[in-house]
């Protein structure tokens, strides 16, 4: 009995991977075995960095809030503690935006929690 092969599915599978490898440098973009490994590694990096991205943005927001709070002589931890105590339900993203782009509004919040 002859060996059963499914060339249509094989071609589709390879075509999908090669399409994902488009834009890669050197043999990574046009040699099947190299492209397959490159795409697999890229997917691992993409998965990891979707998590890292969230961490980085949170750290950025904290730095911005800290900078805004220190202009008024208060540390980040003191400020956030007082914000929670006064039941101000603004998250770090919004507070960071206020500190950077709307300093008057941020100062109002600071004065409210002092």
From Swiss-Prot:
GO terms for molecular function: rRNA binding; structural constituent of ribosome. GO terms for biological process: ribosomal large subunit assembly; translation. Signal peptide: none annotated. The keyword Ribonucleoprotein applies. One of its GO terms (cellular component) is ribonucleoprotein complex. Pfam families: Ribosomal_L20. NCBIfam families: rplT_bact. This is Large ribosomal subunit protein bL20. It comes from Flavobacterium psychrophilum (strain ATCC 49511 / DSM 21280 / CIP 103535 / JIP02/86). The gene is rplT.
């Amino acid at each position: 009995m002859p060996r059963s092969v499914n060339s249509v599915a094989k071609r589709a599978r390879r075509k999908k991977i090669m399409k994902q490898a488009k834009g890669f440098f050197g043999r990574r973009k046009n040699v099947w075995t190299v492209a397959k490994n490159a795409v697999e590694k890229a997917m691992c990096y993409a998965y990891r960095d979707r998590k890292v991205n969230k961490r980085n943005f949170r750290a950025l927001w904290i730095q911005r809030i800290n900078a805004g709070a220190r202009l008024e002589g208060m540390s980040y931890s003191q400020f956030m503690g007082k914000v929670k105590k006064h039941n101000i339900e603004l998250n770090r993203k919004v507070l960071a935006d206020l500190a950077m782009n709307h300093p008057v509004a941020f100062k109002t919040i600071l004065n409210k929690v002092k």
